[in-house]
C-alpha cells in the first residue's frame, strides 16, 4: 500500500530512522 508506505516515511522522520528500518514497528498505525 503506497499510502501506508508514505505514513511509514513520515513516522521514520518524526520518530527515528529505526522505525523505518524495522518495518514491523507500530508507528501509531
Curated annotation (Swiss-Prot):
Supply the SUPFAM superfamilies for this chain: Phospholipase A2, PLA2
Gene Ontology cellular-component terms listed: extracellular region
Catalyses which reaction(s): a 1,2-diacyl-sn-glycero-3-phosphocholine + H2O = a 1-acyl-sn-glycero-3-phosphocholine + a fatty acid + H(+)
Cofactor comment text: Binds 1 Ca(2+) ion.
Q: What class of enzyme is it?
A: hydrolase
Q: Which GO terms describe its molecular function?
A: calcium ion binding; phospholipase A2 activity
- One GO term of the biological process aspect: phospholipid metabolic process
* Alphabetical UniProt keywords: Calcium, Disulfide bond, Hydrolase, Lipid degradation, Lipid metabolism, Metal-binding, Secreted
Residues the entry annotates as binding Ca(2+): 26, 28
* Chief location of this protein within or outside the cell: secreted
> Any transmembrane segments, and where?
none
Entry's localization field: Secreted
Cofactor names from the entry are:
Ca(2+)
Task: Give expression by tissue.
Answer: Expressed by the venom gland.
The EC number(s) attached to this protein equal: 3.1.1.4
Modification comment: Contains seven disulfide bonds.
Function, as annotated, reads:
PLA2 catalyzes the calcium-dependent hydrolysis of the 2-acyl groups in 3-sn-phosphoglycerides.
Q: What family is it from?
A: Belongs to the phospholipase A2 family. Group I subfamily.
Task: State the protein's name.
Answer: Phospholipase A2 D6
Q: What is the lineage of its organism?
A: Eukaryota, Metazoa, Chordata, Craniata, Vertebrata
Amino acid at each position: 500500500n503506497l499510502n501506508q508506505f508514505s505514513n511509514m516515511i513520515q513516522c521514520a522522520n518524526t520518530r527515528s530512522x529505526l522505525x523505518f528500518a524495522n518495518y514491523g514497528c507500530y508507528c501509531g498505525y
